[in-house]
Amino acid sequence: QALEANKFFVVFEPDIQNNLSRMAQRWGDDYNRNKLDGIRAMVFCNGWYANQVSNADPDMLALCPLHITLVEQGGSTRILFVKPSAVAQGSEAEALAGELEQAVADAIAAALQQLGDSPAAP
């Protein structure tokens, strides 16, 4: 919801752990050696940023769609996000990528704030 409130369109929300679990028998002892409880992702994009990135440097369209990965382990969740500013270093889209990165970081912070304000939050 926080991504959509910040004008990012969530395209897909795969349950990666569920998909990987289908391979547990085939992979045997090599399956989930880190004992992760869950892996989910959110694939999203903002049309305005996609247009601006394509205008600045079409090669940076690799940034769209963006994704966040949520890794659950031992009762906590880590949020993983590849920083667009790192990908766009030296590109004509570098400044825009930094702006995009900040917009996503703000959306993540808003989501965490909402969770912190929730009565169900620990």
Model-predicted segments: where are they?
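Ser/Thr-rich, low-complexity intrinsically disordered terminal regions
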Residues: 1-59, 66, 94-111
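Beta-strand/loop substructures that line and gate deep hydrophobic ligand-binding cavities in soluble
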Residues: 64-94
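Short, highly charged C-terminal tails/helix-capping segments
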Residues: 114-122
